[in-house]
């Protein structure tokens, strides 16, 4: 699969419509975490360097096709200006029609224009061809730098890419390269770590992975469901007992595909779910009836350590235990730090994604050591599920 990048495009003197993700958290009208804004800077600066005029398109929140003042991208303007010091950043109060048309016409080389929330128009989420055509009128080239919105076929992600010469921005390019290295044409053996609470939310993911990876590590609450499927009692632990048949199907599918599934060998149990709760480590088959499993134990960590050490590629989505609360973060921390260490030593390509995963790796102090950490959430999951992402498919040449 190939796609054009900024290196393939002649941008001199052209208005470049750039789909970005600036859907940042806000409190009292202030941006509390500008990470997503900072990530688009390389693309914007590259376009400026090539003599293009970047016009930014983005959504913000879920206004459902209506104008909602608290979801205006005007609120993001100060943080965007701060991320681009020395560059004039202007704002237009719509993303189609006379206002942005006039603002684009008035742009000088070296300036950036931010357009209003695309989701203020009901046609955005319906991928309305008329809205996409009205957006396309504003520029000569389209660049998608929002991998996080690539799983949605919207006017500004998919419709627009069909109407103008299109390329991937630097963030999108980095994401696609990392994902291609991890699951497209990976170096083997490939290990996937999948954690989290529920099997039901990750059925497609598990089903796709067993056919594509050599080892599948299952952790978190969903491991309990697999234990139940094998006739093991898990006390008061979180488990989806109605998913036991499905778990057994996944186990047999894995066996047929030659994928080894790793479940906890020992577990850390407690009677209450709170920081510093009295806890003990027991064999997986010996969970007391009045206790709940909150983490994988040291035997499990040691066994996984051997699996990781023999791997060449690792993909991670979801923690191995209740990482938010000490001491039930021990297995996740130990595994994350080892993966980071192997990656730094050049022995492993490691790609991680999903909100909880990123939080867990940051908490463990291991995030910096991974080859690539995706901030994309839903798009990362759908990519891991083997689904086509409309925003990426539209860029494919």
Curated annotation (Swiss-Prot):
Any GO BP:
gluconeogenesis
Indicate which residues the UniProt annotation says bind ATP.
202, 324, 354-357
Species of origin reads Cereibacter sphaeroides (strain ATCC 17029 / ATH 2.4.9) (Rhodobacter sphaeroides)
Associated pathway = Carbohydrate degradation; glycolysis; pyruvate from D-glyceraldehyde 3-phosphate: step 2/5
Any one GO MF annotation of this record: phosphoglycerate kinase activity
- Enzyme Commission identifier(s): 2.7.2.3
GO CC terms in record: cytosol
User: What are the entry keywords?
Assistant: ATP-binding, Cytoplasm, Glycolysis, Kinase, Nucleotide-binding, Transferase
Q: Which domain of life is it from?
A: Bacteria
**Reactions this protein catalyses:** (2R)-3-phosphoglycerate + ATP = (2R)-3-phospho-glyceroyl phosphate + ADP
Query: Is Isomerase included in the keywords of this UniProt record?
Result: no
User: Can you tell me which family this protein belongs to?
Assistant: Belongs to the phosphoglycerate kinase family.
The name under which this protein is listed is: Phosphoglycerate kinase
Q: Where in the cell is it found?
A: Cytoplasm
Membrane-crossing residue ranges in chain numbering: none
**SUPFAM superfamilies per the record?**
Phosphoglycerate kinase (SSF53748)
For this protein, the record's InterPro entries field holds: Phosphoglycerate_kinase, Phosphoglycerate_kinase_CS, Phosphoglycerate_kinase_N, Phosphoglycerate_kinase_sf
Q: What class of enzyme is it?
A: transferase
Q: Which gene encodes it?
A: pgk
Subunit (UniProt): Monomer.
Q: Does the keyword Cytoplasm apply?
A: yes
The primary location reported for this protein is cytoplasm
Q: What is the lineage of its organism?
A: Bacteria, Pseudomonadati, Pseudomonadota, Alphaproteobacteria, Rhodobacterales
């Amino acid at each position: 699969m190939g796609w054009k990048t900024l290196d393939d495009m002649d941008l001199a003197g052209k208005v470049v419509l750039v789909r970005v993700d600036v859907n940042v958290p806000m409190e009292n009208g202030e941006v509390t975490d500008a990470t997503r804004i900072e990530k688009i800077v390389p693309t914007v600066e590259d376009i400026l360097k090539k003599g293009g005029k970047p016009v930014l398109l983005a959504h913000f929140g879920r206004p459902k096709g209506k104008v909602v003042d608290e979801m205006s991208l005007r609120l993001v303007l100060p943080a965007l200006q701060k991320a681009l010091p020395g560059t004039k950043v202007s704002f237009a109060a719509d993303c189609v029609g006379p206002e942005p048309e006039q603002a684009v016409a008035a742009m000088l080389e070296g300036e950036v224009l931010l357009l209003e929330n695309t989701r203020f128009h009901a046609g955005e989420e319906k991928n309305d061809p008329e809205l996409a055509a009205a957006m396309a009128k504003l520029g000569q080239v389209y660049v998608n730098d929002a991998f996080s919105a690539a799983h949605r076929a919207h006017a500004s992600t998919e419709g627009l890419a069909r109407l103008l010469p299109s390329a991937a921005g630097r963030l999108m390019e980095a994401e696609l390269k990392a994902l291609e290295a991890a699951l497209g044409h990976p170096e083997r053996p490939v290990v996937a770590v999948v954690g989290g609470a529920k099997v039901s939310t990750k059925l497609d993911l598990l089903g796709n992975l067993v056919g594509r990876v050599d080892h599948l590590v299952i952790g978190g609450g969903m491991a309990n469901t697999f234990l139940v499927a094998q006739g093991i009692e898990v006390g008061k632990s979180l488990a989806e007992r109605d998913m036991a048949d499905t778990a057994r199907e996944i186990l047999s599918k894995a066996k047929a595909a030659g994928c080894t599934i790793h479940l906890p060998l020992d577990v850390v149990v407690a009677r209450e779910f709170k920081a510093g709760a009295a806890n003990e480590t027991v064999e997986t088959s010996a969970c007391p009836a009045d206790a709940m499993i909150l983490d994988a134990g040291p035997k499990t960590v040691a066994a996984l350590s051997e699996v990781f050490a023999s791997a060449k590629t690792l993909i991670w989505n979801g923690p191995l235990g209740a990482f938010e609360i000490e001491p039930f973060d021990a297995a996740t921390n130990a595994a994350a730090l080892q993966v980071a260490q192997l990656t730094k030593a050049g022995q492993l390509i490691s790609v991680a994604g999903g909100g909880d995963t990123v939080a867990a790796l940051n908490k463990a102090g291991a995030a910096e050591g991974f080859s690539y950490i995706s901030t994309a959430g839903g798009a990362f999951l759908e990519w891991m599920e083997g689904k086509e992402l409309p925003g990426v498919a539209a860029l494919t040449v």
